[in-house]
Structures are given as structure tokens and as C-alpha cells.
């Protein structure tokens, strides 16, 4: 009778498997695999080698605290002639004496998470059990049988593997790209993502069921949506929008997700202060990409927050056009969420592909502050019954805006306002390029098209179906040159009278600082004039906006809202026009000193010229970049920076990975907040 088979050690082939599974950056000390794909391991036996005729090898793989075969969290499988795609299986690749090379495969629908892999050997009546090791299983966009399969290699690289990108801010007429370090493969981030799953309320309520449901990207996406904010749980970020961030970090100051997730994990899942929509979206993007779900950050300009699902945002104003009060139903200058790519077997065919997921805490969904995933195609078709939260997202891109003027006798009169259209310039980063891609067409049919009317009919969007009132008089706000922070500049109310009659009017122009979520600040410019509109004429009325007026009240959004109200007393009519202005920050210049080589020190020289007429104090540069810095670095400048002078610092980098990387920079001082810059750096082999 053959002696018992004894395992000496197991080599999980971490580096080789990491290369094959596109997880090399995660496979420093642990095995990270993508489901539905073969992987290798090597068994070293002592005494004698494996003999197929007398030895039986049985493998076990378990995940979660209470694994079971019924829940899909426990599997037992034996050696077979070849691995079976789509199931737990193992086969022999090669044997050299006491060394056995094996190939294993996981199902394409296995729950993601940490697994324990074991081996049982049996020879006749003898048997032993061995612990082979642990591995982490992720979703697999390269596997056709996986629910997150994406058939474009360029898109897989962009939406799963790329660790840097851009988030779009500013205003619809001045879109600003902000660099961001997602850093999903940086040290400790995968552990933070797995911890996020393990402290979510659904896991704490029913651990076995939660682990089982982690097979579905729909479920995982919804969990991540709820856990990135901390409104119901031990989530990552605390939101704040009142411009008081003294006991934390301003949302505008962040330049990446890595520092946020590390802080959350290292402080025992305590909320990180503070986030706003793009920070919530960026952190969700990092987590979902890390777990293997193709994801991108999306920005919607003129985004509606409709609380009562009537697809209508109503503003009540006094006779001067001023809002009676700030309210919760508002139009945000822009709003960010993420889209993740997946199939939707729970929905009708055609609703697979990009799914909107919004982690910013706005409204509760099934009792939790989360939103989505909802099919972007369902939004485009106006199918508001679709899971999850279709009506809320539809309103974000389609709600109508009605302005009411409350007159002196208390009655209200509807004002014409053709300047504000909800859901414009929906933007995301292009695949493989540092450019913006407009994806509005994926959410909406062309304005005025028959398809658009069909969608509004299906969604019972009655206000959008009503005919727009035309008076023959039109007004829009135009801008001049030089809209940079620190400058005085002009804006213009451009008024056209396309009728044969003369019009006696009063024009009230007002400029106020504004936060990106629509909350107004103090006035920084006004004009009140009477004018006559001659028949078939055009008029351009200027409003001068001075730096000394806006400098003390501009928020970190760098936004000013200009409103024009044209009143025609004889006709008792009001015409409203608005425009949001983004004031450009000064440019951050980045020079790379030395030859960029792997595992060799590199120096970045970072500078900024003071554009203001005053000195800058308390200047701080903060830099980070996946593959360039192990952690975020900050450099303080003790001396004041006089007007017109440049402030310059040097930062040491240590590139660990070859290829293209982004160095992301933030600059703060007493008068300039959250100035961003970046530099692409190509790292060559040592």
C-alpha cells in the first residue's frame, strides 16, 4: 500500500497569476484573482510525488463567516482531465517528480471577496488536510460569462485599470476638468474596499446572505452607493455644503481617493470630513474599479434635485427677481455620480450596459441613502418604473423649471425663463485620452425630437409637453474676456425685440456669488435701469463686476450667478435670464527634473504665479500620484508671496511602476482655494 501523500508547501504563483489576471499591482503579498478565469498553483510534496492511480486530491474554497454550498460560498471539487470554464475545477498542467503544477478555475458568477483554499489528500484509507492559502476574488471584465464583461480592451483599461482621471466641474458654459487620483491599486485600498463590504448594514444583519449576494454587481453597486456616504452606517464620507470645514478638510481640497479611504480604514471606519458630490462619486469609482466593476465618473450640468417626483422645480421670487428663500428642491450647477457597466438580468432586455449609481446622500431609497444602479437606457426611454430610483435620476436630467414672480398684491405671475435647461453637457473622461466626452445622448433624445415627446409622454412629464410661450422679446447673458480670479470684468444683458412695437421696460441686473449646489451668496454687482426697446432692435447692457466686491464672498466653487429680470409694466410680463460664471484659477506649472526611471528618485518643481494685487499667505502645495508617491505629500511655504511673484517648491518622487502616470497637485492659501494642476509623466524601465 502506498504511503500517505504529504504536502510540503504550496506556491500560489502570485506574480504570474497577477500578470494573467490584470492584478499585478495588487499582488505584492497576496493572491488576487478575477472570477471565471484560470489560475495556476504548484504543490510540493515530501517523500513521494502525486500518483493519479492511487491518490485523490479534493479542493475546498470558502468565503464568508458561514459558508454553504447552497449560498454559493462553499465549494468542493476534485482533479479532472481539464478545467471546466464556469465552475470550480482543477486539472494537472505538469508534473516533475514531487512537484505538481495545477490549473484551477473559478465560476464567473462566484461571490467576490476573500477566500480560503484548502486541499484534502486521500490514499486508500489514509487522508490529510492542508491549508493552501488565501486569495481575493474580483469581478472580471475580461470574462465573457461575467456580468461585468466589457468587450473593448481600451475600455477595460480605462474603466478598470486606469488609476487617474478627470472630474468635470465649473459651469455648463465653462467646463473645468479637475484631475483626480483614483488609486484603486495603491497599498491598502483593496483591504479598505473589502472592509467597506464587511461593515455594511446588510452584512451585519445577515452575514451569510450578504456574502452570497456579492456574486451580483447590481447588489455590490447598491451597497457601495450606500457605504460611500455615512448617513445610515459606518460609511466613508460625511457630506457638508455650508462652506464651514474648519474641523475637517474642504471637499474642494481633495485630489484623490487614496487618502480618504486610508483615513477611513486607519481610524476604525470613522467618517472622513468632508465630501460633496464629486468626492462621493470619485471614492465610489475607486471602490468599484478596485472590485473589478468597470466604472466612470459622470457630471451632469444644471442638475435638478426633485424631492416630490413631479419633475418640476419651482422658484418663487419677489418683484426684483430675488429668491424668497433657499430651498431643498434646487438646480445644482453640476452634479456628479458614477456609471458602472453590467448586465441587468432583473430588467427587460436592452437595459444592460451603463448603470447610474449616485452615492451622494440626497434621498432615501428603500430606507437607505443610496441611489441606483439604474439603467441609463431606461432613463433615456422614460421608463420610470425601472429599478432602482429611475424617477429620481430622470428628474436630474429632465425636470422643468418654473419661475413665479410674487407681485406686491400677493398674486403670483409666471415668468418666462428660457436660459435654464436641466441636464446639459453630461460629461465623462474619454477612453485613453485626457479629453472630455459628451454622453448627453445616452440619457436624452435630441431636444424637440419626436422621440423626446414620446419619452415625456411615457414619463407623464406634462410640463415639458406644454407649448412654450413666445413674446417676441428675448434676453440672454453674455460674457466678456478676462474672467479670471482677481480680475474685474464685464457681463452683458443682450436683449432682442423681434416685434414691430416699441417696448418700455425696466432691467434689473444682479450678480451674486453661488455655491455649485445653487445656494446663493452676497451680491457683488447690480444695475437697475429703464430702457426703451425699439422695434426689431438689439441692445447690450453691461454690468461691471469688481474683484473688490466678490473677493470676500466667493466660495471655493469660483462661481458667480448673473441674473437679469426684464419687466414690461404695460404688459405685466417678466422675462428672466441667468448664467453661471466660472472664474479661472491661476495655472500650476510642473517641471520634471531628471530622467523618469523606475525605482529612481525624481524631482518635481511646482510653481504658481500670484495673480492678485495682494500678497498670498499660508501657501501649501499638496501632491500625489499612483505609482509616483507612496503617500500624499504636502509642502508649506512660510514666506508671503507678493503680488505678481511666483511661489515655487520641489517635491521628491519615487516611481515604482513603468508607464504613464499623473502627478496631481492642489494649491491652497489664504486667498486662493483648491487650485488644481497635473502633469503626465512616462516612467521608463530602470
Curated annotation (Swiss-Prot):
- Say which species the protein is native to: Rattus norvegicus (Rat)
Functional summary from the UniProt entry: Calcium-dependent acyltransferase that catalyzes the formation of covalent bonds between peptide-bound glutamine and various primary amines, such as gamma-amino group of peptide-bound lysine, or mono- and polyamines, thereby producing cross-linked or aminated proteins, respectively. Involved in many biological processes, such as bone development, angiogenesis, wound healing, cellular differentiation, chromatin modification and apoptosis.
Q: Which reaction(s) are listed as its catalytic activity? A: L-glutaminyl-[protein] + L-lysyl-[protein] = [protein]-L-lysyl-N(6)-5-L-glutamyl-[protein] + NH4(+); L-glutaminyl-[protein] + serotonin = 5-serotonyl-L-glutamyl-[protein] + NH4(+); L-glutaminyl-[protein] + dopamine = 5-dopaminyl-L-glutamyl-[protein] + NH4(+); L-glutaminyl-[protein] + histamine = 5-histaminyl-L-glutamyl-[protein] + NH4(+)
The positions annotated for binding Ca(2+) are 398, 400, 437, 447, 452, 538
Record-annotated membrane-spanning stretches: none
**Cystines in this chain:** 230-370, 370-371
Protein name according to UniProt: Protein-glutamine gamma-glutamyltransferase 2
The UniProt induction remark is: By retinoic acid. Up-regulated during pregnancy.
Site note Important for catalytic activity applies to: 516
Q: Which residues form the signal peptide?
A: none
Amino acid at each position: 500500500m502506498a504511503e500517505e501523500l504529504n504536502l510540503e508547501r504550496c506556491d500560489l504563483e502570485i506574480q504570474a497569476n497577477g500578470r494573467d489576471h490584470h492584478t499585478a499591482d495588487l499582488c505584492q503579498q497576496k493572491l488576487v484573482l478575477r472570477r471565471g478565469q484560470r489560475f495556476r498553483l504548484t504543490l510540493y510534496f515530501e517523500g513521494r510525488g502525486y500518483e493519479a492511480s492511487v491518490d485523490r486530491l479534493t479542493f475546498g474554497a470558502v468565503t464568508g463567516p458561514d459558508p454553504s454550498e447552497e449560498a454559493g460560498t462553499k465549494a468542493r471539487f476534485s482533479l479532472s482531465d481539464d478545467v471546466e470554464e464556469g465552475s470550480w475545477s482543477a486539472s494537472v498542467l505538469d508534473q516533475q517528480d514531487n512537484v505538481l503544477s495545477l490549473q484551477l478555475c473559478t465560476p464567473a458568477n462566484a461571490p467576490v471577496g476573500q477566500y480560503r483554499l484548502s486541499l484534502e489528500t486521500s490514499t486508500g484509507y489514509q487522508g490529510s488536510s492542508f491549508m493552501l492559502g488565501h486569495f481575493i476574488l474580483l469581478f472580471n471584465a475580461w470574462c465573457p460569462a461575467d456580468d461585468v464583461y466589457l468587450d473593448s480592451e481600451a475600455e477595460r483599461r480605462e474603466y478598470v485599470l486606469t488609476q487617474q482621471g478627470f472630474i468635470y466641474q465649473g459651469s455648463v458654459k465653462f467646463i473645468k476638468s479637475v484631475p483626480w487620483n483614483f488609486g484603486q491599486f495603491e497599498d491598502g485600498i483593496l483591504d479598505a474596499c473589502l472592509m467597506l463590504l464587511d461593515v455594511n448594514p446588510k452584512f451585519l444583519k445577515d452575514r451569510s446572505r450578504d456574502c452570497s449576494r456579492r456574486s451580483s454587481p447590481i447588489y455590490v453597486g447598491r451597497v457601495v452607493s450606500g457605504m460611500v456616504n455615512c448617513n445610515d452606517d459606518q460609511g466613508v464620507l460625511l457630506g457638508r455644503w455650508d462652506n464651514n470645514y474648519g474641523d475637517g478638510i474642504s471637499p474642494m481640497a481633495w485630489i484623490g481617493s487614496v487618502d480618504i479611504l486610508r483615513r477611513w480604514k486607519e481610524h476604525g471606519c470613522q467618517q472622513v470630513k468632508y465630501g460633496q458630490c464629486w468626492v462621493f462619486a470619485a471614492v465610489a469609482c475607486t471602490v468599484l474599479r478596485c472590485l473589478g466593476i468597470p466604472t466612470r465618473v459622470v457630471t451632469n450640468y444644471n442638475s435638478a434635485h426633485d424631492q416630490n417626483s413631479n419633475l418640476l422645480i419651482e422658484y418663487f421670487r419677489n418683484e426684483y427677481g430675488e429668491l424668497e428663500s433657499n430651498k431643498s428642491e434646487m438646480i445644482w450647477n453640476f452634479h456628479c455620480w458614477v456609471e458602472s457597466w453590467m448586465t441587468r438580468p432583473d430588467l427587460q432586455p436592452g437595459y444592460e450596459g451603463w448603470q447610474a449609481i449616485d452615492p451622494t446622500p440626497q434621498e432615501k431609497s428603500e430606507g437607505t441613502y443610496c441611489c441606483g444602479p439604474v439603467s441609463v437606457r431606461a432613463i433615456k426611454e422614460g421608463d420610470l418604473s425601472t429599478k432602482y430610483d429611475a424617477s429620481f435620476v430622470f428628474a436630474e436630467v429632465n425636470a422643468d423649471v418654473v419661475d413665479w414672480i410674487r407681485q406686491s398684491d400677493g398674486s403670483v405671475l409666471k415668468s418666462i425663463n428660457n436660459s435654464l435647461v436641466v441636464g446639459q453637457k453630461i460629461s465623462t473622461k474619454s477612453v485613453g485620452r485626457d479629453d472630455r466626452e459628451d454622453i448627453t445622448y445616452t440619457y436624452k433624445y435630441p431636444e424637440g425630437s419626436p422621440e423626446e415627446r414620446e419619452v415625456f409622454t411615457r414619463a407623464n412629464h406634462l410640463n415639458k409637453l406644454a407649448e412654450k410661450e413666445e413674446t417676441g422679446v428675448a434676453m440672454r447673458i453674455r460674457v466678456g474676456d478676462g474672467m479670471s480670479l482677481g480680475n474685474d470684468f464685464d457681463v452683458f444683458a443682450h436683449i432682442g425685440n423681434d416685434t414691430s412695437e416699441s417696448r418700455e421696460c425696466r432691467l434689473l441686473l444682479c450678480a451674486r456669488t453661488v455655491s455649485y449646489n445653487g445656494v446663493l451668496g452676497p451680491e457683488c454687482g447690480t444695475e437697475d435701469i429703464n430702457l426703451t426697446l425699439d422695434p426689431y432692435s438689439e441692445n447690450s447692457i453691461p454690468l461691471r463686476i469688481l474683484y473688490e466686491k466678490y473677493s470676500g464672498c466667493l466660495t471655493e466653487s469660483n462661481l458667480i450667478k448673473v441674473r437679469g429680470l426684464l419687466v414690461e409694466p404695460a404688459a405685466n410680463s417678466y422675462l428672466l435670464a441667468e448664467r453661471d460664471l466660472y472664474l479661472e484659477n491661476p495655472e500650476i506649472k510642473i517641471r520634471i527634473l531628471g530622467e523618469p526611471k523606475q525605482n529612481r528618485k525624481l524631482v518635481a518643481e511646482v510653481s504658481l504665479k500670484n495673480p492678485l494685487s495682494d500678497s498670498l499667505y499660508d501657501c501649501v502645495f499638496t501632491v500625489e500620484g499612483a505609482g509616483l508617491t507612496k503617500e500624499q505629500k504636502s509642502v508649506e511655504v512660510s514666506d508671503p508671496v507678493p503680488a505678481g511673484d511666483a511661489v515655487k517648491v520641489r517635491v521628491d518622487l519615487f516611481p515604482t511602476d513603468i508607464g504613464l502616470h499623473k502627478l496631481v497637485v492642489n494649491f491652497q492659501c489664504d486667498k486662493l482655494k483648491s487650485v488644481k494642476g497635473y502633469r503626465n509623466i512616462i516612467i521608463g524601465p530602470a
